[in-house]
């Protein structure tokens, strides 16, 4: 139809079965060939947890939903600013990582096609994980984007876990609520990119900048305010532009 959106956009949704008056913003993850929107909804607050619980209870009974969802948007945040940056340093923390997922998915689809027509030459992603709500669905995308060319690199920081909490290799687990199936697969190379503490931004950004000295770098941040101050300080010290949320 007339619904136009770009990667990184979000919509507000209202579900009368949950609340008549409340509207909540959710990131657009992708759109199917039939025109259905796939949104990233995390059950980490009262409204979205209610939505999650009610959806599961309905599916368990008769495997169908007949709810009317009202939608307002889209609003952006598009991927344009990232695609127009030669060296994009993405920093996602907590729920903020979901902002980058559709953008990275879009870039992933363009890899090998017409990405050469954009200024973007290199992506460094820094992912700060405070809980594992977003780990399952994001790891496969990282695995798919990692290639030999060095175009895309990622660094993962578990700040709620110790190395002892993991086996030697990290597992990807996907759950299909409708079929009640669980698929588990091993992802080898995530382990090499993982740390168990907050990064030293002076060190990480200096390394990143030195490796890409011929490219103009920008940092894009999405996540809680508590992680922003040290990042902002390092960006200022190293003279790297910092863009938060509005991109």
What are these regions (language model features)?
Residues 28, 97-116, 140-142:
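Histidine-anchored nucleotide/phosphate-binding helix
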Residues 83-88, 118-122, 215-216:
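A short, charged/proline- and glycine-enriched loop
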Residues 79-82, 114-115, 209-211:
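Short boundary motifs at domain starts and secondary-structure transition points
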